[in-house]
Amino acid sequence: MSDQEFGLDAIRNIGIMAHIDAGKTTTTERILFYAGRTHKIGEVHEGGATMDWMEQEQERGITITSAATTVFWLGAKINIIDTPGHVDFTIEVERSLRVLDGAVAVFDAVSGVEPQSETVWRQANKYGVPRIAFVNKMDRMGANYFGAVESMREKLGANAIPVHCPIGSESQFVGMVDLISQKALYFLEETLGAKWEERKIPEDLQEQCATLRMQLLEELATVDESNEAFMEKVLENPDSITEEEIHTVMRKGVIEGKINPVLCGSAFKNKGVQQLLDVIVKWLPSPLDRGNVRGINLKTGEEVSLKPSKDGPLAALAFKIMTDPYVGRITFIRIYSGTLKKGSAILNSTKDKKERISRLLEMHANERTDRDEFTVGDIGACVGLKFSVTGDTLCDENQEIVLERIEAPEPVIDMAIEPKSKGDREKLAQALSALSEEDPTFRVSTNEETGQTIISGMGELHLDILRDRMIREFRVEANVGKPQVSYKETITKTSNSETKYVKQSGGRGQYAHVCLEIEPNEPGKGNEVVSKIVGGVIPKEYIPAVIKGVEEGLNSGVLAGYGLVDVKVSIVFGSYHEVDSSEMAFKICGSMAVKEACRKALPVILEPIMKVTVITPEDHLGDVIGDLNRRRGKILGQESSRNMAQVSAEVPLSEMFGYMTSLRSLTSGRATSTMEPAFFAKVPQKIQEEIVKK
């Protein structure tokens, strides 16, 4: 099918998101199978899933990178991004949600809402992504569809509305009643569930289905209060409402984020996947429904609103970089306005660099098809971009527009790394550079005192997998040290400094004079460096050098050498020498000045605090809470259901190394826990002194 056959209203850009192990990749595999993209179904537990194309993913049975693929269904073109459910890969979820128009949240019918489902749901709220839900694994022991719906309401605050009523559950799960069409769908075992037949609603479910349908209609009546005809029918003659009318109101409610319809099925047993595909097309938004996208015009500094039109100016967002052994560097983009053609010259407005597109590729996991152009609403990949990284805006050379960036959280864990042989030193540097371009939460730095290379990331699994990739993709063998906490430094009061850098040693001297004011920035806002220089006391051409020096100075703090965060620096005054001043002199002076100001601004050390959720049998609850308290944890809350208790707490990461092992021994292996970065907080004075001594 060529793209020309698809209007914008027939495109769906969707993500599939869930907690690890809810069956998300299996659901995507079935979608690919039924939509005719794969001729053989990939099974995750056999290591053959199409979307999990990296070797590490196939070995570990988890999804690490968001694979993008395109399928066709009911006359629509669906671009699907499969996202990882493990907390160490939150940036993958964050960046895919940023470019999606809608999402399918997959839940496990036994567990309902799990901790990672809450994280992903919060991220989707942040970007206002409309969602429908699929309660998967209805064939499992203990499956409870209505329990899962209830947990969505309680834990996520979702307006979850069942649109199915399951027929049987666990091994007796044979199908579902569609509350909209009022038909019972029975999946035929001889076709492995690929086909089904419609029958009458079984007698023992008729009353329950009538109640559920009425609740569904009443909820829909509140979605669009201007639609009086629909409200009237709901109140006076609900049986006269057509399926078409229900779908219209349902679509409006989903797109406006007022409702989250919930379907059920078992992807593994092929039940309910085609029904899910139908409603992806019927209810989730097209790029047109998501409306205009906001950006900033760089020439005027004003906010602009871009219509989703293929004739408009080009505006695209790079949301992922991949290094491919055959093609080289691939940049994934989403086009919000205009058309991008193969061979065209464009501007990376974030970096003010010109780029040229050498190839355009439509991706299916790791297979690819060449394309001549991508237009508004498309998600695709480009080859040939040299400077663009995640979050950069690509636009026409004469239309300087910047779109909202993708925020990357600060890494929380550090490891020292060195090549096993001296000959690998350069290869290691190349590998680290390529990997940090792909993943904004992976940072590479050098410890100034020891000269060691330090890699930082979101957790041990994150760094483990990157190390695996170095060995496999870049053929680099490296030794890594023990994981360490990634501490940060910040300041707690306002201060200033006046610094002169003067050198006279025969020949041309060096001269720079810089005055700074520094103040604490809002937590989580990062560092800001601004110039308030007026009247040319420092010439305009030297200001970027001062800023660069200040930024480099902030890379290592004054207490223990950890990077400074949340500091606002203003360059307020200075002077220069006609002959002796240079960019280098001002850069060195900027770095010295910011260090001097920080020493006077009561610096403190910050540590990453993790949100920890533990699910434990109730008889071990006391031990688990006692253990978290000993680790300087702050208990946020606990709840119980079916002899299991869930405890949530905030605990410093430094106290959590080896936690899984001790939790297993505390609870005889019956408890599970998840941990995700929450925020950075000041360390207690006694611990700060110990860190500084080290």
From Swiss-Prot:
> Start and end of every tr-type G domain?
9-288
Q: Which SMART domains match?
A: EFG_C, EFG_IV
GO biological process per UniProt: ribosome disassembly
Q: Where does GTP bind?
A: 18-25, 82-86, 136-139
Keywords attached to this entry:
Cytoplasm, Elongation factor, GTP-binding, Nucleotide-binding, Protein biosynthesis
Where located?
Cytoplasm
Q: Where are the transmembrane segments?
A: none
Enumerate the InterPro entries for this protein. EFG_II, EFG_III, EFG_III/V, EFG_IV, EFG_V, EFG_V-like, EFTu-like_2, G_TR_CS
Q: Does the keyword 4Fe-4S apply?
A: no
In its keyword annotation, does this UniProt entry include rRNA-binding? no
One Gene Ontology CC term in the entry:
cytoplasm
Q: Name any one GO molecular function.
A: GTPase activity
Family indicated by similarity: Belongs to the TRAFAC class translation factor GTPase superfamily. Classic translation factor GTPase family. EF-G/EF-2 subfamily.
**Role description:** Catalyzes the GTP-dependent ribosomal translocation step during translation elongation. During this step, the ribosome changes from the pre-translocational (PRE) to the post-translocational (POST) state as the newly formed A-site-bound peptidyl-tRNA and P-site-bound deacylated tRNA move to the P and E sites, respectively. Catalyzes the coordinated movement of the two tRNA molecules, the mRNA and conformational changes in the ribosome.
Put simply, this protein is called Elongation factor G
Classification of source organism: Bacteria, Pseudomonadati, Chlamydiota, Chlamydiia, Chlamydiales
